[in-house]
Amino acid sequence: YNEEDVKKAAQMINESERPIVYFGGGVRSAAGCQPLRDLLEKTGMPATYTLMAAGVLSYGEPHNLGLLGMHGCYAANKAIDEADLVIAVGTRFSDRVALNPDSFAKRAKIIQIDIDPSELGKNVDVDLSLTGDASYILQAILPYVKKTEHKLWMEQIRGWQKNDYKPVDSDTELKPHQIIDEICNQAGPEAVYVTDVGQHQMWAAQYLHHTKSRGFLTSGGLGTMGFGYGAAIGAQMALGRDARVVMLTGDGSFHMNLNEACTAVSYDLPIITVIFNNQVLGMVRQWQTTFYEKRYSDTDPHRKTDFVKLAEGFGAKGYRAATPAEFKAAFADAMKQKGPSWIDCRIGKDEKVLPMIPGGGTVNDIIME
């Protein structure tokens, strides 16, 4: 990038009335969390992010609209649709975000910032591209942008947020969002959260409220099931045994690499594994329910694994929970353990990740129930 492009980007930001920052894992890789936050605070722009950037901004920050894309927030997707300027930082406009490239941010000019020049304008046409480290470019832009608040734009977005999907609590059944809320309440903002791949991964990205910068580890892009336990072990070893590491997984993903429990037990690593056990391959099954008239194929493996006995066989501590009260008690006890523990959370096989925008669709096609 050069100084003229930096000044042009700043000018486009200064002249826009409805700007939004859309950022991805490149911001995390570039250690660009604080430069991004500085830009948002000075300009008053809202921001939304991809799965790979979850945790870069904390959940309660006023500029944070939440996750974007197929399973993203209604308000975030609507804001992209209505924006007059999109600043895309460290992201590639994947098919989980730009579900319909021809309709993506159709009212907006687009600035794309990426370290890889081959990504610039590859999936979506852009008006200005800057090649380089996201952290340095954001810092370079900052002196040239005006301090503003975009009050009218933010008021409009707050109105859309009233229509964001709101899950319903239950006292008798274990709901995914309640599991994650309880994890947040007990493990807190200093914990490192790791996921496998599947529905639980999306629920984690949607509902983990306390993640700190670089405190959310997940496998996006390739979406490799079985990633979680090995990643959790790596995080625990890197941070030390006194750190809190929580691994969220599904029964499908966990079956693919649960042999890693041998390593966790051998080294007495106090990793808490929370298994979202719906006894199906839930993400694919959700697609079959929604788009293929409930023609289920290869998503119900009819497993009868007893995770509590399996944990004990490995030398870990095992729990089972079917209600919010049972999960609260199990997680509290797991927090006291000196070695690895697993909590088998029994959830319904028809639980869905919502909202959902179908592939090729737009925010106008969003499914809320």
Question: What are these regions, as identified by a protein language model?
Answer:
Residues 1-15:
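Conformationally flexible catalytic loops at phosphate/diphosphate-handling active centers
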Residues 45-52, 111-114, 271-276:
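Short internal beta-strands
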Residues 53-156:
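Glycine-rich, acidic loop regions that bind phosphate or pyrophosphate groups
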Residues 75-94, 202-281:
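Thiamine diphosphate
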Residues 82-83, 137, 289-330:
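Conserved thiamine diphosphate
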Residues 97, 324-369:
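Glycine/aspartate-rich loop-and-adjacent alpha/beta segment that forms the canonical ThDP
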Residues 126-138, 259-277, 356-358:
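A short alpha/beta connector and helix-capping loop motif
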Residues 158-238, 355:
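Active-site diphosphate/adenylate-binding microenvironment
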